Amino acid sequence: MLSCNGIVLNYAFVMYNKSISKINIVENIAKELPVPLVMSYFLCDCWYTFEKIINIFAARGFHTIGALKTNRMLYPFGFKKKLNEFASLLLITRSNFHLVTVKKQKYYVYRYEGKLNGIENAVVLLSYPEKAFGNPKALRAFLSTDVALSVDETLSYYACRWPIEIFFASVRIN
């Protein structure tokens, strides 16, 4: 999905062909995109937040905002640490988490800016729903290659994915 000037759209419908990987399909779509005239974002789930895809979209002028798996490697303070392990360490003090509201839902969020495997500098948001703060199963993480975005902006842009995800789910069922 692409976000440009406040509008979020599914850019292309491509029938899945098992002879071509989903990653290659996304690569081909990215290479066909026109260069955006304003700040634009590739919105994606955790399958597409890795170096190769991020770099292809960056070359076309798009930042990436997407989900991350909680076993993704970060480098806080220069030390390699799994995202979920880093979140557990942060819970000891709890002081670095801030309560934010996105579309009437409240979340405790920690903002990390730094290195990930294959990505020199990005923002990663570690997020817990307000009522599940500290529950390892409730931990969600989001990446933004646009480090200038606020926590609220990043989560608000990412939340724009859900209507289209619901559409895809209904298409798969039918």
List each language-model region with its residue ranges.
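Single, function-defining residue in the core of a domain
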Residues: 4-174
